[in-house]
Swiss-Prot record:
Annotated Gene Ontology cellular component terms: cytosolic small ribosomal subunit
Disordered: region residues: 117-142
Name under which the protein is recorded: Small ribosomal subunit protein uS9
InterPro entries (UniProt xref): Ribosomal_Su5_D2-typ_SF, Ribosomal_uS9, Ribosomal_uS9_archaeal, Ribosomal_uS9_CS, Ribsml_uS5_D2-typ_fold_subgr
Family stated for the protein in its record: Belongs to the universal ribosomal protein uS9 family.
Gene Ontology terms, MF aspect: RNA binding; structural constituent of ribosome
Compositionally biased tracts (Basic residues): 123-142
């Protein structure tokens, strides 16, 4: 876990963005007591357990540092898991920027390379003349 030593010139507020497919999350990180709210709801009360676990990964990895900030996240678009991954990316980027910690950044990159970079995959668009992106009529050569 990263040490709790913080640089003297920590920013007062950090705004970070995370994206996954069409889900976009904007996180506002400020000094506090460890409160995390997603669209106004506390993270502990989030209804979907898998999404809650995915969103709490950056906080668990940060350890004691996460208890020194309050995080407010607004997320929209996509499905519930896409939103969870977008929140996770926004929180991880924001914590690294807030504490300006190279150690925390390396910890996140070792745990999951996509926690800071994001996932570049997007949905392939539908082509004209066929029902879906790649589906075609079956051919029979008899």
């Amino acid at each position: 876990m990263p040490s709790a030593e913080v640089l003297q010139e920590t920013p007062r507020v950090v705004i970070s963005v995370g994206k996954k497919k069409t889900a976009v999350a904007r996180a506002i990180i400020k000094p506090g007591i460890g409160r995390v709210r997603i669209n106004g709801y506390p993270l502990e009360l989030w209804p979907i357990e898998m999404a809650r676990i995915k969103m709490s990964e950056p906080l668990i990895l940060a350890g004691e540092l996460a208890k020194k900030v309050d995080i407010d996240v607004n997320v929209s678009g996509g499905g519930y898991m896409g939103q969870a991954v977008a929140v996770r990316i926004a929180m991880a980027r924001g914590l690294v920027a807030f504490f300006q910690s190279q150690e925390l950044k390396e910890l996140y990159e070792r745990y999951d390379p996509y926690m800071l970079k994001g996932d570049p995959r997007r949905t392939e668009h539908k082509k004209p003349g066929i029902k879906h992106a790649r589906s075609k009529r079956q051919k029979a050569y008899r």
